[in-house]
């Protein structure tokens, strides 16, 4: 059964509440752009592609409701202005992820173009927006599968390590990933986790390793949930164990293949290849370089921001202190009776200062390739990415 995080039919949108995973599976309805803003900001939905799609579809639902109840203006410019204001509001929910801003800009241009057509009414402008937002859902799944296939092929061609041939003679790889980049972070299949899924589908994956990803634990809560759901051989490690994992030739249950590649997603890729992603990504890239392990970024072209020249220009979101000092989960059941009620506990000394950036920036010099839906972009002989060539 395929894991579905976003369910949509015209006029109806539900998201899988990721704050409750892996212990509860609850779908929250979103009726408006305001509902989506709160869901994104509270991280009930997260992942750069997913938040862009949820934001776009939430406004589609709101517009459909207004149109069917005759509450939309007949004036196309008024409806266009309403849509642009709602899109601007949605972008403010998580400023680091470029997909959201890119989608808002693209949808805004479609709306402006439709509103300027002579004889068009307000409902038709809304309809143009709704159709464009709905296409985003289908396009993302298609793009993710292409990313998975391209990435898997590149890894097998470039990242096979000594000892990576199984007893059957088939090349197999072990891959480490960070945060969550699967069906929960996209419309489906995933980016970095999509590569892992593609490797597994062809029998080429020995084992996937996922980091816990403190402080929000997207790895232990979400990626581990997806890997178990898909019956992919996987091992969870804490963030601080990554260096030790790369340093040894074998690790984990039934493991005989050293890690060949670290594959991560991205929230924004600058024009030069500098990559903003979940905090801890930069450290993994440094470790990969030291240990001679390939480091790959998997992201659709919508994540590449050609208007941002380098990573120094990327705004890094900072999250509340309590995300570091507290942790939430169900009470462990007594005497094998399962899980108890959800509780929040404190894990830090009272009064300690906290710095909690949600993302860091990995320099392009540490990235071996950027996996997109149109192929893997590598650096030229002088170590420079030419990302403009894929647009």
UniProtKB/Swiss-Prot annotation:
Provide the Gene Ontology terms for cellular component: cytoplasm; nucleus
Per its record, the protein catalyses: 5-(methylsulfanyl)-alpha-D-ribose 1-phosphate = 5-(methylsulfanyl)-D-ribulose 1-phosphate
Q: Write out the pathway annotation from the protein's UniProt entry.
A: Amino-acid biosynthesis; L-methionine biosynthesis via salvage pathway; L-methionine from S-methyl-5-thio-alpha-D-ribose 1-phosphate: step 1/6
Q: Where is this site: Transition state stabilizer?
A: 179
- Share an example GO biological-process annotation for this protein: L-methionine salvage from methylthioadenosine
Q: Which Pfam families match?
A: IF-2B
| SUPFAM superfamilies referenced in this protein's UniProt entry, alphabetically | NagB/RpiA/CoA transferase-like
Q: Which Gene3D superfamilies match?
A: translation initiation factor eif-2b, domain 1, Translation initiation factor eif-2b, domain 2
Instruction: List UniProt keywords, sorted A-Z.
Output: Amino-acid biosynthesis, Cytoplasm, Isomerase, Methionine biosynthesis, Nucleus
Reported EC number(s) for this entry are 5.3.1.23
Q: Name one GO molecular function term.
A: S-methyl-5-thioribose-1-phosphate isomerase activity
Annotated catalytic residues: 267 (proton donor)
Q: What does this protein do?
A: Catalyzes the interconversion of methylthioribose-1-phosphate (MTR-1-P) into methylthioribulose-1-phosphate (MTRu-1-P).
State the similarity comment: Belongs to the eIF-2B alpha/beta/delta subunits family. MtnA subfamily.
Q: What is this protein called?
A: Methylthioribose-1-phosphate isomerase
Source organism per UniProt: Ajellomyces capsulatus (strain NAm1 / WU24) (Darling's disease fungus)
Its ancestry begins with:
Eukaryota, Fungi, Dikarya, Ascomycota, Pezizomycotina
Gene for this protein? MRI1
């Amino acid at each position: 059964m395929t894991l579905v995080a976003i369910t949509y039919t015209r006029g109806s949108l539900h998201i899988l509440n990721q704050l409750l995973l892996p212990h509860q599976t609850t779908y929250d309805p979103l009726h408006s752009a305001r509902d989506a803003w709160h869901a994104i900001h509270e991280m009930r939905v997260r992942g750069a592609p997913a938040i862009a799609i949820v934001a776009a579809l939430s406004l589609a639902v709101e517009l459909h409701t207004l149109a069917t109840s005759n509450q939309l203006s007949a004036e196309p410019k008024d409806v266009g202005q309403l849509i642009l204001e709602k899109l601007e509001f949605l972008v403010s929910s998580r400023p680091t992820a470029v997909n959201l801003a890119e989608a808002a800009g693209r949808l805004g241009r479609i709306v402006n173009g439709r509103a300027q057509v002579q004889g068009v009414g307000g409902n038709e402008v809304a309809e143009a927006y709704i159709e464009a937002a709905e296409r985003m859902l289908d396009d993302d799944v298609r793009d993710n599968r292409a990313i998975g296939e391209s990435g898997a092929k590149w890894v097998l061609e470039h990242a096979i390590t000594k000892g990576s041939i199984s007893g059957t003679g088939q090349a197999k790889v072990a891959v480490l990933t960070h945060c969550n980049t699967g069906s929960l972070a996209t419309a489906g299949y995933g980016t970095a986790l999509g590569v892992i899924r593609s490797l597994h589908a062809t029998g080429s994956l020995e084992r996937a390793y996922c980091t816990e990803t403190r402080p929000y634990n997207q790895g232990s809560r979400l990626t581990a949930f997806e890997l178990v759901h898909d019956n992919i051989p996987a091992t969870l490690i804490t963030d601080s164990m990554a260096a030790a994992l790369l340093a040894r030739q074998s690790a984990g249950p039934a493991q005989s293949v050293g890690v060949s590649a670290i594959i991560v997603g991205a929230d924004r890729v600058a024009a030069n290849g500098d990559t903003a992603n979940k905090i801890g990504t930069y450290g993994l890239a440094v470790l990969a370089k030291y240990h001679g392990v390939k480091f790959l970024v998997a992201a659709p072209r919508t994540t590449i921001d050609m208007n941002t020249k380098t990573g120094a220009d990327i705004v890094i979101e900072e999250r509340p202190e309590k995300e570091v000092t507290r942790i939430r989960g169900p009470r462990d059941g007594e005497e094998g009776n399962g899980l108890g009620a959800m509780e929040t506990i404190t894990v830090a000394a009272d009064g300690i200062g906290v710095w909690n950036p949600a993302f860091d920036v990995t320099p392009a010099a540490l990235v071996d390739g950027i996996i997109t839906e149109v192929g893997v972009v590598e650096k030229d002989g002088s170590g420079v990415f030419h990302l403009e060539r894929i647009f």
